[in-house]
A protein has these predicted regions:
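Linker/hinge segments immediately adjacent to helix-turn-helix/homeobox DNA-binding domains
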Residues: 33, 95-102, 109-115, 123-231, ...
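Active-site rim helix/loop that mediates acceptor-substrate recognition in acyltransferases
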Residues: 27-59, 67
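Conserved acyl-donor/pantetheine-binding loop and adjacent beta-alpha core of acyl/acetyltransferases
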Residues: 69-120
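Recognition helix of helix-turn-helix DNA-binding domains
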Residues: 245-295
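A short beta-loop-alpha structural element at the N-terminal edge
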Residues: 1-17, 28
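Conserved GNAT-family N-acetyltransferase fold
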Residues: 64-68, 124
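Short alpha-helical "packing" element that flanks the helix-turn-helix/winged-helix DNA-binding module
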Residues: 233-240, 249
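Short helix-to-turn junction characteristic of helix-turn-helix DNA-binding domains
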Residues: 237-244, 304
């Protein structure tokens, strides 16, 4: 049994073991990678998922790790033109030297409401030696998780690097293009002078809509959010989608259970103003419990799963 969940800081050492060697990390690079990845998770600037086992002798083992980040225009421009292979390694080294690589949360909100975002897969790895059927299931589940991670953001460039033949056929089959290629014997890194052929894959918003296809079009052209939620209300819904209870939220956020309940009441009030039909079929019980309260929440979360733009960071533009 396998499941996909949000990556936790405590997962990162195991995640590094999975990708070790793919990016020619030195010992110093490894320490910097752990620090950088932890910073991205703690600051909510990174999007990350792990696929783990749910049962059996390896219960809890991480089989797949993915970490994505919204990078600056300058870093994306270099990634597509002049940076050497191993973009995840180059990002770690840039960050370690004090240079800007990624956008902070407030900048993500600004660009998500404006010109759009540059999404780069910073690290991706699969545990070696997986049986063929497990490997295929894991890849399918992570692809679905990726759609959930990216949906609702206004993306202008989407880029992922692949080494050798790993994921090559999968990516091309979805319509992703090869943007750069490095030959087999390119001097990829001082730590490892020769390596497998490397490709940089991606899509950008400037192409023709028909070139994107239905699989990708919504990532570049998300609907406008309608509910007008505050950042605190968005966080409440996001955590609920991750199956956190109200008590879980109160503990993890360091707020009272009353504050959590108040957030839900504010959300319902906004929904009733904008889309009253969404909740009218399940009554008006308050959120303190009961069948109607449970059904109202279930209906609301079902809507949000289909409209993740409602909970993405987004600056309110002044007109």
């Amino acid at each position: 049994m396998l499941t996909v969940r949000a990556t936790r800081p405590s997962d990162l050492a195991a995640c590094l073991d999975i990708v070790h060697g793919r990016y020619a990390f030195s010992d110093g690079d490894e320490r910097a990678a752990l620090a950088y990845w932890n910073h991205l998770l703690e600051s909510r600037a990174g999007l990350s998922r792990v696929l783990t086992t749910l049962a059996g002798p390896d219960e809890g083992r991480i089989l797949v790790f993915a970490l994505c980040v919204f990078v600056t225009d300058d870093f994306m421009r270099e990634a597509l033109t002049t940076l050497p292979p191993h973009l995840g390694l180059q990002a770690v080294r840039r960050w370690r030297s004090g240079k800007r690589v990624h956008l902070a949360l407030r900048e993500i909100a600004r660009d998500n409401a404006g010109d759009g975002l540059n999404l780069l897969t910073l690290a991706y790895g699969t545990a070696p030696g997986l049986p063929r059927d497990v490997d295929l299931q894991a890849r399918a589940m992570m692809a679905a998780a990726g759609r959930d991670m990216f949906s609702g953001y206004r993306i202008k460039n989407l880029v992922q690097e692949g080494l050798g033949t790993e994921l090559h056929a999968d990516l091309l089959a979805t319509g992703v293009k090869v943007l750069r290629s490095f030959p087999t014997h390119a001097p990829v890194d001082p730590c490892r002078r020769n390596g497998p052929p490397t490709h940089v894959y991606g899509l950008n918003r400037d192409g023709r809509p028909e070139d994107l296809g239905p699989h990708w079009w919504m990532f570049f052209n998300p609907p406008e959010p309608r509910l007008g939620l505050s950042e605190a209300e968005k966080e409440t819904l996001e955590r609920a989608l991750e199956n956190e209870t109200d008590d879980d939220m109160a503990r993890s956020l360091g707020i009272s259970i009353w504050t959590v309940k108040k957030r839900w009441q504010n959300v319902y009030s906004k929904v009733e103003q904008v889309a009253p039909a969404l909740l009218s079929a399940v009554g008006n019980a308050d959120e303190t419990g009961g069948a109607s309260g449970f059904e109202r929440r279930r209906h609301l979360l079902a809507y949000v799963r289909q409209h993740l733009e409602e909970i993405r960071p987004r600056e309110v533009l002044r007109r």
